[in-house]
Amino acid sequence: MAVNLQIPSESEILPVAGVEIGVAEAGIRKAGRRDLTVFRLAPGSAVAGVFTRNRFRAAPVQVCEAHLAQGGPIRALVVNTGNANAGTGAPGLKNAQDTCAALGKLLDVPAEQILPFSTGVILEPLPMDRLTAGLPAAVADLRADGWYGAAHGIMTTDTLPKIHSRRVNIGGKTVTITGISKGAGMIRPNMATMLGFLATDAGIAQPLLRQLAIELADVSFNRITVDGDTSTNDSFILIATGQAGVTVDSAGDAAYAALRDALAAAATDLAQKIVRDAEGATKFMTIRVEEAGNTEEALKVAYAVAHSPLVKTAFFASDPNLGRILAAIGYAGIDDLDVSRLRLWLGDVLVAVDGGRNPDYQEADGQRVMKQAEILVRIALGRGQVADTVYTCDFSHEYVTINADYRS
């Protein structure tokens, strides 16, 4: 059950000049399900990517990194769902390369100018016969307004498509930003998102785009977690087609800050949508750590709380057993933490002060907050002035059911 997940209507999704998308049913995931997506990018488009830090990197991730490292143009992307092409060794690597070659022939572009992406079951061979047979239909479907279909086409256990679209004024010009993401489980990206594609018709110089992709991932997709698992296939792609008549060459350009902020807002929304649609989620939780000595320790504490199964199940049950939060803070890895300076709020309710229970705290007040669909947990460490935030969800019975039945 998605938690307050707002999806724009198809008519509200804005095409990005220079991007065409086609979707097809290849039978990789399930019969009658769109599971193959192709992006075609106009000449002159700039592309940058950020990928999983999992050492068990999927074959398509390796191919993407190799193609981007060549420094040439990227003219197309191809995404399949239902199979991750991970844990497949040399044959899987060849399949990812062959996918690029097959699409390249259809689009008349070199294979090294294509980026492949896969998501789904790990340790299973990619069904190349079905994938390559589906490519012509995806290419035939290419159109500027293909974002809505693509958002559906990249889904796995997602219950709803995740789309963001907006227009902003940059340097007196109208700039369009549209993106999609997918993911509902195995989400602690530590780099980007499960799969995320964000495009703008502004022009951004390639070196700046690479740095911007890293920054956007860090403030958005690197701040979410569902279950603490980092996927083998996580990929975030940032595309700038340069069709809007606005070009940013350096971070010092007057237009850069406004464009960066608009892209960051889009990326953050796409990241939060993943948590709102997390497998079995009934609560959307914001874990904010304040008064930390640095960002690293703020995130250590936030993730310790966000990853704790005991904390997550307590929120599912609306059970104010909040000592579980204190325990998670204690094992977060800050060796010199002075717990006597710690304060904890649940929404507007002060639960703990000076490392112990607030004398005025009433459990009924805590439970009132925990029954809400969206919950803010604030933790003040009393160590400094740095703050950071992580977004997560509860663990429900449905999470276990979804993952137990995933391959059945």
Curated annotation (Swiss-Prot):
PANTHER family hit by this protein: ARGININE BIOSYNTHESIS BIFUNCTIONAL PROTEIN ARGJ, ARGININE BIOSYNTHESIS BIFUNCTIONAL PROTEIN ARGJ, MITOCHONDRIAL
Single GO cellular component term: cytoplasm
Pfam families referenced in this protein's UniProt entry, alphabetically: ArgJ (PF01960)
Organism from which the protein derives: Bordetella pertussis (strain Tohama I / ATCC BAA-589 / NCTC 13251)
Subunit text: Heterotetramer of two alpha and two beta chains.
GO MF annotations, alphabetized: glutamate N-acetyltransferase activity; L-glutamate N-acetyltransferase activity
Record Gene3D superfamilies: arginine biosynthesis bifunctional protein suprefamily, ArgJ beta chain, C-terminal domain, L-amino peptidase D-ALA esterase/amidase
Keywords: Acyltransferase, Amino-acid biosynthesis, Arginine biosynthesis, Autocatalytic cleavage, Cytoplasm, Multifunctional enzyme, Transferase
Annotated catalysed reactions: N(2)-acetyl-L-ornithine + L-glutamate = N-acetyl-L-glutamate + L-ornithine; L-glutamate + acetyl-CoA = N-acetyl-L-glutamate + CoA + H(+)
Domain of life: Bacteria
Pathway the protein takes part in: Amino-acid biosynthesis; L-arginine biosynthesis; L-ornithine and N-acetyl-L-glutamate from L-glutamate and N(2)-acetyl-L-ornithine (cyclic): step 1/1; Amino-acid biosynthesis; L-arginine biosynthesis; N(2)-acetyl-L-ornithine from L-glutamate: step 1/4
Record-linked InterPro entries: Arg_biosynth_ArgJ, ArgJ-like_dom_sf, ArgJ_beta_C
Residues given in the record as substrate binding sites: 156, 182, 193, 279, 403, 408
Annotated positions for site Involved in the stabilization of negative charge on the oxyanion by the formation of the oxyanion hole: 119-120
Subcellular location: Cytoplasm
Taxonomy of the source species: Bacteria, Pseudomonadati, Pseudomonadota, Betaproteobacteria, Burkholderiales
Recorded name of the encoding gene: argJ
Cytoplasm is among the record's keywords: yes
Single biological process term from Gene Ontology: ornithine biosynthetic process
Protein's recorded name: Arginine biosynthesis bifunctional protein ArgJ
Similarity comment text for this entry: Belongs to the ArgJ family.
